[in-house]
């Protein structure tokens, strides 16, 4: 069990992910300009290869790490006897709940090397945000989420997102709201089970 406060972002990891490729481009560019002033294959390698590798890293690196770390966390949970009753794979969060034991496991995209396995009693509030905006026939949403507070930190997990506004009675929106409501209920049940185990309920 992780007793540390939840941390959604590891800023060292975030900065390394962004800036290490830039440093590589700068260093190799300097080498190319210094030692291959007349061009040629060496200059092409120094200028083009690091840029290509950086782009590939930015596109695939963090997402590959994220995917591998999710699998590693699931294996860790299984080894610990954590029953994965409900799992939600968000773009930036993974939330897994063992309802009977009242436990929650969290993994964050920008802090992928630390999995937080916590008693659900640390959740102080959980709710659905349908993202509704506008009025009349313009009323709609482009984002539906369930949110919860744990250790005073707000965690938002999207169940529906779009780059345009959808009407509130649209099937996709209603499905997103239904998923969010279900997760609020799951968190409430896990919290109750956790408090019963702790003798605080």
Q: Where do the model's predicted regions map?
A:
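Glycine-centered tight beta-turn/hairpin loop motif at sheet-sheet or coil-to-beta transitions
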Residues: 92, 111-113, 150-154
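Hydrophobic alpha-helical transmembrane segments of multipass integral membrane proteins
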Residues: 21-28, 51-55
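Short secondary-structure junctions
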Residues: 78-87, 125-128, 132, 198
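Juxtamembrane "helix-exit" motif on the non-cytosolic side of transmembrane helices
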Residues: 27-38
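Phosphoinositide-binding peripheral membrane targeting modules
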Residues: 100-141
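Juxtamembrane interface helix immediately N-terminal to a transmembrane segment
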Residues: 2-23
